[in-house]
Each structure stands twice: as structure tokens, then as C-alpha cells.
Design a protein with these regions (language model features):
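Metallocofactor- and cofactor-centric catalytic cores in central/energy metabolism, strongly enriched
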Residues: 1-101
Length: 101
């Protein structure tokens, strides 16, 4: 089976040392790599719990023989922007977040 994550390693082998530098183990490099995105952040209670869920997802990926790498995008909160000019950007920010995925 052709694994996209392994094909990408062939195209850009210089990324392996960078990943090891961020805490990956050498044996993780040969596994199926799954990116797990989260909006986890400490700025408001709506996203403060998401890191726990990300770790559960990563655990499931590892149990199936893969490696789950986490990455984060912004966690805009409508509740904090209400009553300010920031609320005008709420819908636009959701589109930007969707485009990051």
C-alpha cells in the first residue's frame, strides 16, 4: 500500500531531522503519520478541554500503529467578542479556520 506520509518523506528527506528535533522518535518516522488539528487554547473555557481529546485521538492512532502529530489553529470565541467591533470578524474568522484545515 502506498502511504502518502512515506511518499512525502522521499520528496523532502530534510524534514526527518526537523521532526526528530521537535520530539518525534526515529521509529515514528516510518509509521503512518496522521495530523491531528485542534483549536485548544487557554484564552477561554470553550477550548480549554480540547487538548485532552487530542491526546485520546493520538493514543488511538498509536494503538493502530500510526503516529499522531498535533498542530493547532486559532480559537476565536464569539462570547468574548460580543459587544465589540471584533464580533464583525466572527464569521470571517470561521472561514479562515476552515481554510487552515
Amino acid at each position: 500500500m502506498c502511504l502518502k506520509s512515506q511518499e512525502m518523506r522521499k520528496l523532502a528527506p530534510e524534514l526527518d531531522p526537523l521532526r526528530i528535533g521537535t520530539g518525534w522518535k526515529k521509529e515514528d518516522l516510518g509509521k503512518v503519520q496522521v495530523m491531528v488539528e485542534s483549536t485548544y487554547g487557554d484564552s477561554h473555557p470553550g477550548s480549554g478541554h480540547l487538548n485532552i481529546l487530542v491526546e485520546e485521538v493520538r493514543k488511538g492512532i498509536a494503538e493502530e500503529g500510526g503516529f499522531g502529530a498535533r498542530y493547532f489553529c486559532t480559537d476565536i470565541c464569539d462570547g468574548e467578542s460580543q459587544g465589540t467591533d471584533g464580533i464583525n470578524y466572527s464569521l470571517a474568522s470561521r472561514e479562515m479556520i476552515a481554510n487552515m484545515i
